[in-house]
């Protein structure tokens, strides 16, 4: 495939505009557009729950509701999971997320495809400065799930789509509407009105509860006047998803200062299908088109693994990131979830895993309220419980980002002393 003509740095909170750069690419499923009754009958449909966004957060919530037998509609502007032809995106899933997926019925699929790991090593130059083995910690055996599984995000999203269909066979289900873009929204007292554009025209639906899981570039922030706190960083990275033909790496390694990358940071993770995800920190003024060229990436790989390394590049592309957090997890009928609520740097696997926890927190509460088994006030606890988690994740990842690229003298001195 040819390189994308748009090679700008993009936010790590990936959106449907995240462009394929170059490489063999990933093969993703495609789901057909099925015209809903509202479009065919030219009427306004009414639904208790509408989820906007079919990424890992929205699909996790949809699966949780389907398991509880709560009817809902999920709208996504694409016709596939992941991002068409794009990268592995989130890859590291924690024990807590895996426990949730066990309850939802997809853990076994994840375990078969993904890679379990518990050992990590961190280097500064050629010196190992830190290591851990989570299996050695006393809390490890308290769960049936492993400490971590690495797997490309689109696989989990695909398993969630499968599971939602399975759960809908014998109980009220969640309707997945692909190629359906929300173009307008307004609050109307006890409900909200959404306008949806499709390949066959537009229609409207009413919802008692709207969940915005569209990601960091959501239009709902502007529609609702949501207040956000955050900043954009100038750290630049390049992802390379690589399949080695000879002498692959053996462990998860992190370099705070990698001698083969101009003493900048490097992450090295094994994912499903024997594909390695390698993240290279770039200079702040790097040209994204230059750093993601195949010949440049191969030269970088040779510096790391030796000139005789043989590998296929599955995907490569540049990214930047910012951090931000909403002040309210709920405004009126709308709940913010996942990257819509907070955007964090990728360090510590706190993006997708937090969205999964958001979804699990809200699913049972929505089910209880929709069924009339709990008062509406129960939904207020979503903000109380999940905002603190979002703020904490932004704080922790910002601290990590400052350590990886200190810009102030005090931060530089602290890093030198720590290493």
Regions found by a protein language model. Name each.
Residues 45-47, 199-209:
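Core beta-strand elements of the Rossmann-like FAD/NAD(P) dinucleotide-binding domain
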Residues 56-66, 78, 101, 160, ...:
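Conserved mid-domain beta->alpha element of the FAD-binding
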């Amino acid at each position: 495939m040819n390189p994308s003509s748009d090679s700008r740095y993009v936010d790590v909170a990936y959106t449907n505009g995240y462009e394929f750069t170059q490489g063999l690419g990933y093969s993703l499923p495609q789901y057909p557009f099925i015209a809903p009754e509202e479009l065919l009958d030219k009427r306004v449909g009414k639904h208790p729950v509408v989820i906007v966004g079919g990424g890992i957060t929205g699909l996790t919530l949809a699966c949780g509701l389907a398991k509880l037998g709560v009817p809902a509609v999920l709208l996504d502007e694409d016709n596939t999971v992941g991002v068409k032809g794009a990268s592995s995106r989130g890859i590291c899933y924690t024990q807590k997320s895996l426990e949730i997926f066990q309850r939802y019925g997809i853990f076994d699929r994840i375990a078969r495809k993904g890679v379990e790991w518990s050992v990590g090593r961190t280097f500064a130059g050629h010196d190992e400065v830190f290591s851990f083995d989570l299996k050695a910690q006393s809390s490890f055996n308290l769960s049936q799930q492993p400490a971590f599984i690495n797997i490309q995000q689109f696989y989990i999203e695909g398993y969630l789509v499968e599971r939602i269909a399975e759960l809908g066979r014998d109980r009220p289900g969640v309707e997945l509407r692909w190629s359906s873009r929300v173009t307008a929204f307004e609050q109307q007292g006890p409900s909200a009105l959404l306008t949806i554009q499709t390949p066959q025209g537009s229609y409207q639906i009413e919802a008692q509860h709207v969940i915005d899981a569209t990601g960091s570039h959501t239009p709902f922030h502007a529609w609702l006047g949501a207040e956000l706190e955050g900043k954009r960083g100038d750290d630049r990275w390049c992802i390379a998803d690589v399949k080695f033909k000879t002498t692959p790496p053996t462990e998860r390694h992190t370099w705070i200062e990698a001698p083969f990358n101009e003493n900048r940071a490097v992450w090295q993770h094994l994912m499903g299908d024997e594909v390695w995800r390698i993240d290279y920190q770039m200079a702040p003024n790097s040209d994204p088109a230059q750093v993601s060229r195949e010949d440049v990436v191969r030269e970088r790989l040779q510096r790391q693994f030796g000139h005789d390394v043989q590998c296929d590049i599955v995907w490569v592309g540049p990214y930047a990131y910012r951090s931000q957090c909403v002040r309210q997890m709920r405004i009126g009928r709308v709940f913010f979830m996942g990257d819509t609520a907070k955007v964090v740097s990728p360090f510590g696997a706190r993006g997708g895993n937090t969205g999964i926890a958001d979804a699990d927190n809200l699913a049972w509460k929505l089910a209880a309220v929709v069924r009339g088994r709990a008062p509406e006030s129960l939904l207020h606890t979503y903000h109380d419980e999940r905002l603190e988690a979002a703020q904490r994740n932004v704080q922790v990842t910002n601290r990590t980002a400052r350590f990886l690229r200190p810009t102030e003298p005090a931060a530089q001195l602290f890093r030198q002393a720590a290493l």
